[in-house]
Amino acid sequence: TVRVGLVQWQMRSYKTLDDLFEQVEFFVDAVSDYKSDFVLFPEYFNAPLMSKYNDKGESQAIRGLAKYTEEIRDRFINLAISYNINIITGSMPYVKEDGLLYNVGFLCRRDGTYEMYEKMHVTPDEIKSWGLSGGRLLQTFDTDCAKIGVLICYDVEFPELSRLMADQGRQILFVPFLTDTQNAYSRVRVCAQARAIENECFVVIAGSVGNLPRVHNMDIQYAQSGVFTPCDFAFPTDGKRAEATPNTEMILVSDVDLDLLNELHTYGS
């Protein structure tokens, strides 16, 4: 059995990275207290730091936010070791050596190693407002308790990506997302449930809630984070293992049994 924790993150103003990470560490501490193996943060959870660049255009502001990314990664690596938990850092903007801007995140293992994952399908708004480019890196990751994959938000709406990961033996799919409206959220949620059923895996989604004044293009958020399962006799009849309260800051902790997946692959309905 693997225990997963997710953070339904409230957007609020933070003046500094230290302020933001006081809240981050609080959640890592809280989730690790429940002996979780993983903690998942949402897409662009660090967006409040863009308020510092509020006088700039949107494409400049997001590049300002990207300046924090490497330090954020290093802080997460330290937290993963300190609290003995594998951290999936949601996502954040990152400027690669080619000078282009990508939406990426990191798996920070509790042994101190890390991996990077990339959003491959950036949304029309990410292109128009921020000038983001889509990544090309698709891979699964070995951890001390499960083989996992991460798809950032919109990417979960493309069945092929998850299918390729399933072929590599992925057992748990993590989906950090950020959606502003309920219809946008429904696209992510329904597709996440579809991926759990068609690929016979667990899918964990985490998003942000609340409002964010003084950050352009980030005004409102809507989320109901959750843990989804295949639909068969050994699983919940509706494929929902656990769900957060909609639009409320909270953590959700849930156990998933990987042995049930092996049984399903062989003897499922």
Give residue spans per PLM region.
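Active-site catalytic loop in hydrolytic enzyme cores
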Residues: 96-171, 181-194
